[in-house]
């Protein structure tokens, strides 16, 4: 693994027309309370509304998978072969929306597939909310996340990181934060 994360502002995503089109599609999704590991113990750890794009054949899925594949080849070298459905997340001030420290993979499951890469696409302008900061726990890897904090939370920013990296979204104290996540999967880590 050459890097701990990949961070970019994809030109097509930073175009407001493209982002507004994605947000419009997200607004048609049915939202439900986000869970932690398919269990209803989320109030302490997670407070967000989520919806899923059930059709994996949408252009956004292909675009994000293509980006992840390229980033994986250049930086991580994981065995990846598919995606899970794109997840749309909403963190609201009225809920103190957050997702406390967690990882996106489960090393203890009995499945033959595992989340390998996590992708977050920021849909909100940082002026539209306070708090709600995406933070990666990368200090043990010799990286100061503070150097990347502001950039990672810009509208249109896209970050790809190994699903085993601890991360969180801090509580939203004003406004609403919107983002998309996609998980790239592959055979279990050996």
Residue map of PLM features:
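Non-heme Fe(II)/2-oxoglutarate
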Residues: 1-87, 96-98
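Catalytic core of non-heme Fe(II) oxygenases with the double-stranded beta-helix
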Residues: 73-190
């Amino acid at each position: 693994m050459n890097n701990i994360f990949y961070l970019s502002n994809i030109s097509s995503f930073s175009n407001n027309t493209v982002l507004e089109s994605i947000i419009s599609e997200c607004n048609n999704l049915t939202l439900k309370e986000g869970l932690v590991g398919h269990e209803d113990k989320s109030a302490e750890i997670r407070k967000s509304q989520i919806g899923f794009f059930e059709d994996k054949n949408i252009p956004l899925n292909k675009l994000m998978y293509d980006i992840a594949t390229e980033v994986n080849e250049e930086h991580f070298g994981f065995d990846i072969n598919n995606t899970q459905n794109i997840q749309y997340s909403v963190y609201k001030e009225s809920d103190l929306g957050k997702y406390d420290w967690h990882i996106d993979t489960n090393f203890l499951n009995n499945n033959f597939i595992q989340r390998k890469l996590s992708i977050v696409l920021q849909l909100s302008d940082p002026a539209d909310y306070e708090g709600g900061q995406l933070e990666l726990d990368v200090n043990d890897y010799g990286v100061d996340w503070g150097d990347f904090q502001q950039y990672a939370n810009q509208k249109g920013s896209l970050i790809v990181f190994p699903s085993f990296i601890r991360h969180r979204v801090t509580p939203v104290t004003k406004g609403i934060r919107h983002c998309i996540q996609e998980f790239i999967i592959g055979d279990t880590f050996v």
